[in-house]
Amino acid sequence: MIAARFTNSKQLISQLNCALSPADALCAIAAISDSETTEVAVISALLQLLSRHHHHSSVATAAVEVLVKLAPASVEPLLAAFRSCSDQGFQAWIIQALAMIGDAKAFDLLAEVVGTEVANHCQGNVRRIAARGLGKIGSTVKDREVTDRAIEKLHWALVTPQDWGLRYAAVVSLQEIATPQAHAVLSAAVAGESDWVVRSRMKKALEQIPAC
């Protein structure tokens, strides 16, 4: 059984490494999904494939879906891949995967991305995705301190940036966390919000979150 698993892992890695076209990449990703393997070597090979094909949205989307499926085993490899690569396109897909997973190990990175100054629309979108990841972490983690830190960072995102999309994402995340502290943050910010879309979303969130 061990030998068979080892051979299967080698085959999966080989298929990932040899995938030169988007069609081949999608087949290799499907094989990983079907195998449900959580071996680090296979996950690392999948990340390498994502780094090569991240500009093909269908391939990148499929890879992210599998990386989310393989969590929590995929979290550490995703974090390591982000730190070791400077390609912003590849990093954006990593952030999307980590935000969808919502593992507390990714909190510091997601918080860092939320606070990053942006030079273009794509980078701004990554910040919004990271903010949504903080909402998922803050609403599911059992550590109260982590939840409080998530609310603190989302509060910053709500009142500091000029990016209305980031503020909107922060509102949705605070509603997801849904604690009295989240309600207090939204309540204090709603009067000063200049964008009517964001302000309307704040009011909707406040109706759904308990004040105490």
UniProtKB/Swiss-Prot annotation:
Which Gene3D superfamilies does its entry note?
Answer: Leucine-rich Repeat Variant (1.25.10.10)
The keyword Lyase is assigned to this record: yes
Recorded GO molecular functions are:
lyase activity; oxidoreductase activity
Lyase: present as a keyword of the record? yes
Q: Name one GO cellular component term.
A: phycobilisome
Q: Which domain of life is it from?
A: Bacteria
Sorted alphabetically, the keyword list is: Antenna complex, Lyase, Phycobilisome
* Pfam families in alphabetical order: HEAT_2
Q: What does this protein do?
A: An enzyme involved in the biosynthesis of bilin.
Q: Which family does it belong to?
A: Belongs to the CpcE/RpcE/PecE family.
Q: What is this protein called?
A: Bilin biosynthesis protein PecF
Give the classification, highest ranks.
Bacteria, Bacillati, Cyanobacteriota, Cyanophyceae, Nostocales
The protein's gene is named: pecF
